[in-house]
Every structure is written in structure tokens, then in C-alpha cells.
Regions:
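Ordered, helix-dominated protein-protein interaction surfaces in large eukaryotic regulatory proteins
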Residues: 30, 36-40, 61, 65, ...
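Short beta->alpha junction loops
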Residues: 49-54
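Short secondary-structure boundary/capping segments
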Residues: 12-13, 71, 87
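Structural micro-motif
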Residues: 64-75
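Local sequence-structure signature of Cys/Sec-based thiol-disulfide redox active-site neighborhoods
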Residues: 4-48
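Structural motif
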Residues: 55-60
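C-terminal alpha-helical interaction module
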Residues: 2-11, 16-17, 93, 99-107
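Non-catalytic, surface beta->alpha helical segment in thiol-disulfide oxidoreductase systems
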Residues: 74-107
Length: 107
């Protein structure tokens, strides 16, 4: 499956000026793990629970053009990816510098 590189407008509006945005589903355990990872790093995230948002279905459809599964994480307005990319970035030591560059982490 080919994914779009550029987020659709509805996603760009939600991502806005927030350093870290996570699109999740409230019952997804992988989503919970990603949210806890960022919280454990001391990052204040903006979370959109797709199953609780009024425009959740539209958002989900737009996000599936970017990633095959939730959570879908944006750092500094750029798509980081889903749980696999987040964890790989964390394990490789690349996540913290990305968060610092985005202004989400100061230490």
C-alpha cells in the first residue's frame, strides 16, 4: 500500500502548532503504550481519540492515507508514524532529539 507523504488538510488543522500530536482510539492498547511512553519522557502531548471526536471518522479516513494503523504520531508537525516507528526512534536514540527540536522537550 502506498501512503501519501503530505497530510490532508483536516489532519494539518488538527496538528497545527502543537509539538506532539497523537491520533488514537481509546480502546487500543498500543495507543496507550505510546501515550505512556511520551508521558514517561515528560512530553505534554495533544491527543485526539478518534472514537470520541465528532469528526473522528473523517479524521480516521484521512489518517489511513498516511499510516495503516493507530496510533498516528506527529512531532513538530511532521509525521513520525505508528507504534513501530515511535519505538524504533526511541530505541535508536533519535526520538529525544526530535522532541527537543520540536520544542516538546527541554532537558
Amino acid at each position: 500500500m502506498q501512503y501519501d507523504a503530505e497530510p490532508p488538510e483536516i489532519v494539518r488543522r488538527k496538528v497545527g502548532e502543537n509539538p506532539v500530536v497523537i491520533f488514537t482510539v481509546s480502546t487500543c492498547y498500543l495507543c496507550l503504550a505510546v501515550k505512556r511512553l511520551f508521558r514517561g519522557l515528560g512530553v505534554n502531548t495533544t491527543v485526539f481519540e478518534l472514537d470520541e471526536e465528532p469528526d473522528g471518522k473523517e479524521l480516521e479516513k484521512a489518517l489511513m492515507r498516511l499510516s495503516s494503523a493507530v496510533p498516528v504520531v506527529f512531532v513538530g508537525g511532521k509525521l513520525l508514524g505508528s507504534v513501530d516507528r515511535v519505538l524504533a526512534s526511541h530505541i535508536s536514540g533519535m526520538l529525544v532529539p526530535l522532541l527537543k527540536e520540536a520544542g516538546a522537550l527541554w532537558l
